[in-house]
């Protein structure tokens, strides 16, 4: 006999899990771990949105270079961020970042946009979203 009623568990399986990662830390290791975990979850099928704020928003600047690579794989957070972007994540800088920095929108890495507060608020409220902050 076929099942006629879809359960909540069935619905969760068919909908991609939404993850909103907010990175604000200036710490190289914290930025690196945020990128490593975000990329790992993205590889597991999570639909990823990343918001870069405060000093972490520097990662979104095309010319930015971290002071050093992180062991054990010799990666820099901005390199991992580029992998995340290339894999289809939505990445944005905080709406307050550019107006309060010396950068313009054209300085952003390709694939990074300026966050729209109303849209971000909607994503944060979504019952299907998990929010992580670093």
Task: Please state what every model-predicted region is.
Residues 48-54, 91-95:
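Short internal beta-strands
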Residues 68-93:
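A glycine-rich helix N-cap at a beta->alpha junction
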Residues 56-70:
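N-terminal beta-loop-helix "entrance" segment that forms/cooperates
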Residues 26-28, 55-58, 97-101:
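Solvent-exposed loop/turn segments at secondary-structure junctions
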